[in-house]
Amino acid sequence: MNTKLFKLVLTLLAFVLIFSSCDRKRSATTGWNYNDEKNGGFEYVFYEEQETGPGLVLIEGGTFSMGRVEQDVLYEWHAFPRRVTVSSFYMDETEVRNVDYREYLYWLRRVFVDYPEVYKMALPDTLVWRKKLAYNEPYVELYFRHPAYQEYPVVGVNWRQANDYCAWRTDRVNELIMVREGLLNMDPTGQTGENNFNTEAYLAGQYEGAVRDQLPDLDPNNDFRKVRMEDGILLPKYRLPTEAEWEFAALGLIGNMLAQERIFNERIYPWNGHYIRIDDRSGFKTTDVGQIRANTMRGRGDYMGMAGALNDHNDIPGPVTSYWPNDYGLYCMSGNVNEWVMDVYRPLTYEDAEDFRPFRGNVYQTQVRDEEGNIAEKDSLGRIRYRNVTDDEAFNRRNYNTADNINYLDGDYESSIDYDNEEANKDNTNSKRMYNTGKPMIGENGKPTMRGGDKMTSMIDNRQRVFKGGGWRDRAYWMSPGTRRFLDEEQSRDDLGFRCAMHRVGSARGGIE
C-alpha cells in the first residue's frame, strides 16, 4: 500500500514538473510566448546551475561568529566576535602555486610584446627572502623559477598583483568556455596587445576574436548574435575573498553540524581540538596521531623539527596540497603561507560592518562612456575603462552618496576629532585625519618636526589590506582564522600568498532550489 502511494506521489510530481516547465515558456505577466521570433524573440534561458570554475570548491554559506575565539594575547582589540552571514561562494582548493603564476607571466610577456612594463609590474618580488643576518640567496634565485618548487605557493606578490592575477584568470577561463562551446577558436598568434580576449570587452562588443560560430538570434531582424551575460555561459569574476568569506571557509564549521542548525563544538583552528597536532584517532590512521596539521613554527628556532623526525616536514612553504584539508576540502587554510583578502584594514571593522556579507573597501565605479552614452573605447591593454562615481551621480541615493566608502564610520570626518569642522568635510577620503593627525611644521634647524602635543601618527591608512591564516614563519597563535594582520597593498612578504574566490549565482546550495 505504501509502495503504491509512493509511486503515485512520484507520478504526480513528474506531471507538476512537466506542466510547470511548459508554463515557463510563456510570460506569466503578459502571456506572450518566450523564445518566439514571431513576437519579437525575447529569450528565456532554462538555466540549471552555475558551473564550477577550474580549481574552485563550493563553499555553502551561512551564519557564524566572526572574530577571535581565543585570548587576545597582543591586546589589539580589533577582532571582536560578531555574528554575521556569508553567502555561498567558491574558493580555490589550494593557494595559487608558483607554476600558476608563471603561466600568467608567460601569457603577459607573449601578448603584451609592445608593453614590457606590464610583465615587469607583475613579477613577484623574490628579494623578500633576504634577511640581513641570514643566507637566503638560494631562495631568491630558485624558489619561484625552479621546477622543484612549482607546486609550492607563490610568495612575494603584493595585493595589487594578486587582484590583477584574478582578473586575468577570469578572462582565460571564460575564453576557454567560449572555445569549448564552439563559439571561438584558440588564436594564440592573433592575440597581441589590446586584441586579447577580455570578458567585459567581449560583452561590450569590442572584441571579435577568431569566431568559429555564433548563437542563433530570435530577433527577427538578425540571424545570429554573440554571447550575452543573460545566456549564463560565462562565469562571474575570479577575485580575492573578503575577510568574512575567508574566515568562514577556513573554519569549516559545516563539519561540526551534528543536528539541524546546531554546532556543538566551536573551532580555534580549521580543525577540532586545542592543538596543532592530531590528538584524535577518529578519521585518521593510527600513525597520523601526533602529526602536526599545518606548516608552522613550533618554537623559537624550530621551523621543521629534528633530522630523522621532522615535525611539519617543511622548512619553508611546502606543496599546496600538504597536510589534511578542512571540512570544505580546502588545503592549508592555516599555515604554509598567509593569504591576502580583499578588505581594507580598520581596527573596528568587526563592529561597524554590515552583518550580511561584511566588507570594508568599497569604491564604486562605473564604465566610462562617450558623449552619445556608449561604452568608451577600451584601453591599450584591451580592458574596458572605469571611473569613480561622482557625487552628483550618487546624489539623493539612500544607500551611498559618494564613490569612496573606505573611510565610512572609521576615518571620515564624522568619526574624527574634526567632526564639527566644515572645512574637514571637503576631503572625506583621506584617512590621515583619523589615524595620522600629526601636523608637521618646520623647526628651528630647518627640518620637519611635529608641534608639541600633536605627535599622533599611525600605520593605518586606505592602502593597508588584511591578510590572514598564519605562515611557515608564524607561531600557532596566527593559525586561528580569527586573527588578522595588515600590510600595505604594494608590499609583500616571503610568507604571504593568496587564493581566489568567486561569487555563486542562483541557489545557495548546488543542485537544490
Which stretches of residues belong to each language-model region?
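Bacterial N-terminal signal peptides that target proteins for export
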Residues: 2-9
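C-terminal motif of bacterial Sec signal peptides marking the signal peptidase cleavage site
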Residues: 19-21
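Functional-site microenvironments in short loops/helix caps that host divalent-cation chemistry
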Residues: 26-36, 58-59, 65, 70, ...
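Post-signal peptide N-terminal segment of mature Sec-exported envelope proteins
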Residues: 30-58
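A short glycine-rich, aromatic-capped structural motif
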Residues: 48-137, 150-173, 335, 504
